[in-house]
Amino acid sequence: MLASSFSHNGLTGLGGKLYFTVHRLEHEVSGMFDRVAHGAGLAVLFPAWAKYVYRHFTARFARFAYQVMDVSKSLTEEEAAYEGIIRLEAYFRQIGMPVRLSELDIDETSFEKMAEKALGQNDTLNGIIPLNKNQIIEIFEIAK
């Protein structure tokens, strides 16, 4: 509970802008499919989202790869960033979490509706890069 409180009280943002893009996407997954727990949906969507956006923030994803996922510093930042995402996805699989929407019995027939619901009345979903409907669908495609 303490970790949950810290993650939602702004403390971890250190005064920076906080985005919960993946949470917003996942809320539509578990909102449409009540059999999907929030954590399971996040385990599927975070790696897919990261694969979509990491090139815009290569240094940050590489730092995560080096410091958290123990990726070799002999790799370029871009290679390390991607490898870190792959290792995180493998870790989720190792601990028994789903890593694909298909593992949650969700297919592409739901992607457009989930994207529309994630956007609400907006044209884009704010985040480290703003995402439009087609980009959100692409993330769901990566996660399928």
Label each region the model flagged:
Residues 61, 68, 72-144:
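C-terminal charged capping/lid subdomain of soluble metabolic enzymes
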Residues 1-86:
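Active-site segments that bind and position negatively charged phosphate/pyrophosphate groups
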